Amino acid sequence: MHIAEGVLPPVQCAIWFAAAAPFVVHGAVQVVKQIKHHPENRLLLATAGACTFLLSSIKLPSVTGSSSHPTGTGVGAVLFKPPVMAFMGLIVLIFQALLLAHGGITTLGANTFSMAIVGPWVGYGAYVLNKKLGGPLALGIFLAMFLSDLSTYCVTSFQLAFAYPDPSSGVLGAAEKFLGIFAISQIPLSVAEGILGILLFRFLFKVAGPQLQALGVRIGNKRTANAEVPEVAHV
């Protein structure tokens, strides 16, 4: 998904930077508030960032100028809500661009918009909807991980299509081609990421159950950690 350096025209790079900036600034404020008012959640915050960094560093060949990989942003979206992931995702993308040659600085705005903004919001929306409908926690986590990944690549496909429209079918035709290529690798990766998310949250409930309870990650309407942690072990 990381669009490489020099792939997008300068004007489009500037547009994506401008589109991402308000979300990132708001996210930075939320991260500072989270650390200041809830210092006990710093390890969970670090876990969310590490998950995004590690999973999105897996680089598989795909569309020229981009790549396929999991995103890992669903974890942070479920734990701390999407605004936090806008800022943390930007930090991850900067490190990857500078240290791993994964992505680029000029395309940082576009990559942030797709992976750190749209992906977390779509995944979180699915998680909340599942919760309101009374679905199991495991399903909500799976959907958050699965859809945050897929939606990221949908946005990336259109970003590339705007830069390289098809001569005959235009932007929509190009987007269809990019989506088709990404789907080959990304659908299986998204499913695997969803399953990994369930396993990760099982572990987190065992080691940080009270913190997850306080963040609102719970089964049903029960509020006591003792009642919920054993149940999560079987989701």
From Swiss-Prot:
How this chain sits in the membrane, per its record, is: Multi-pass membrane protein
Record's subcellular location:
Cell membrane
Q: Which UniProt keywords apply?
A: Cell membrane, Cobalamin biosynthesis, Cobalt, Cobalt transport, Ion transport, Membrane, Transmembrane, Transmembrane helix, Transport
Q: Name one Pfam family in it.
A: CbiM
- The keyword Membrane is assigned to this record: yes
Cellular component, GO annotation: ATP-binding cassette (ABC) transporter complex
UniProt GO molecular function: cobalt ion transmembrane transporter activity
Per the UniProt record, which residue ranges are transmembrane?
A: 6-26, 43-63, 85-105, 108-128, 133-153, 181-201
Q: Name one GO biological process term.
A: cobalamin biosynthetic process
Q: Its pathway? A: Cofactor biosynthesis; adenosylcobalamin biosynthesis
Predominant cellular place of this UniProt entry's protein: membrane
Q: Which InterPro entries match?
A: CbiM (IPR018024), CbiM/NikMN (IPR002751)
Q: Disulphide bridges in this chain?
A: none
Quaternary structure?
Forms an energy-coupling factor (ECF) transporter complex composed of an ATP-binding protein (A component, CbiO), a transmembrane protein (T component, CbiQ) and 2 possible substrate-capture proteins (S components, CbiM and CbiN) of unknown stoichimetry.
- Name the family the entry cites: Belongs to the CbiM family.
- According to its UniProt entry, what is the function of this protein? Part of the energy-coupling factor (ECF) transporter complex CbiMNOQ involved in cobalt import.
Q: What protein name does the entry list?
A: Cobalt transport protein CbiM
Question: Organism, per UniProt?
Answer: Propionibacterium freudenreichii subsp. shermanii (strain ATCC 9614 / DSM 4902 / CIP 103027 / NCIMB 8099 / CIRM-BIA1)
